[in-house]
Swiss-Prot record:
Subcellular location: Secreted
Residues where 4-carboxyglutamate is found: E3, E4, E10, E14
Effect of substituting Y5V: Little loss of inhibition of NR1a/NR2B receptor; important loss of inhibition of NR1a/NR2A receptor
Family: Belongs to the conotoxin B superfamily.
Additional comment: Adopts an alpha-helical conformation in presence and in absence of divalent cations.
Protein's recorded name: Conantokin-T
Length: 21
């Protein structure tokens, strides 16, 4: 659902931040 989708996007964003750090 929409909530799961938003959580998934949040997780992807966090992964990108950690990768770029």
């Amino acid at each position: 659902g929409e909530e799961e989708y938003q959580k998934m996007l949040e997780n992807l964003r966090e992964a990108e931040v950690k990768k770029n750090a």
